[in-house]
């Protein structure tokens, strides 16, 4: 067996469907398009969402909500993830990036209270929840709010 003699297993590949190449192929004459009608013509596709003149679903349903212009996109870290750091260490943006807990700072870093922290840490972030602060301070840690 050589690399230039490798072939896929029998039945692992299919021949492509060659349409409109004679009746013997099984896909001749109408070339799998049936008889007449819009879908049999060239360029005869119907645009997405078109319902034959009936008011389409995306126009029947009301618009909802809005996007706040000043919304901040925080990188989220849960306190359960902070156990990767050694006790007494300072956890800041650089440390979180190096540990792979966040992929970027975005509009800041926010710490949430999901999970449990067992080590005393000094956490320096842009935002945090009240529960997260409670849990960090309960094990002798400290949380500081920094500006971006």
Swiss-Prot record:
One of its GO terms (biological process) is translation. Residues 30-39 have a biased composition (Basic residues). Residues 1-61 are annotated as: Disordered. The keyword Ribonucleoprotein applies. Keywords: Ribonucleoprotein, Ribosomal protein, RNA-binding, rRNA-binding. GO terms for cellular component: cytosolic large ribosomal subunit. It comes from the Bacteria. One of its GO terms (molecular function) is structural constituent of ribosome. InterPro entries: Ribosomal_uL15, Ribosomal_uL15/eL18, Ribosomal_uL15/eL18_sf, Ribosomal_uL15_bac-type. Part of the 50S ribosomal subunit. HAMAP family: Ribosomal_uL15. Belongs to the universal ribosomal protein uL15 family. PANTHER family: 50S RIBOSOMAL PROTEIN L15, LARGE RIBOSOMAL SUBUNIT PROTEIN UL15M. Binds to the 23S rRNA. NCBIfam families: rplO_bact. This is Large ribosomal subunit protein uL15. The lineage of its organism: Bacteria, Pseudomonadati, Thermodesulfobacteriota, Desulfuromonadia, Geobacterales. The gene is rplO.
């Amino acid at each position: 067996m050589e690399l230039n003699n490798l072939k896929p297993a029998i039945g692992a590949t299919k021949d492509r469907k060659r349409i409109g190449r004679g009746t013997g192929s099984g896909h001749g004459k109408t070339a799998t398009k049936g008889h007449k009608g819009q879908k049999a013509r060239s360029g005869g596709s119907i645009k997405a969402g078109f319902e034959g003149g009936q008011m389409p679903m995306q126009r029947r349903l009301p618009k909802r909500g809005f996007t706040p212009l000043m919304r901040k996109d925080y990188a989220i870290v849960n306190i359960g993830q902070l156990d990767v750091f050694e006790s007494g260490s300072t956890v800041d943006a650089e440390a979180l990036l190096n540990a792979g807990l966040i992929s970027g700072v975005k509009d800041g870093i926010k710490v949430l209270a999901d999970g449990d922290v067992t080590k005393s840490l000094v956490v320096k972030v842009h935002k945090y929840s009240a529960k997260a602060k409670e849990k960090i301070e309960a094990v002798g840690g400290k949380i500081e709010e920094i500006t971006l």
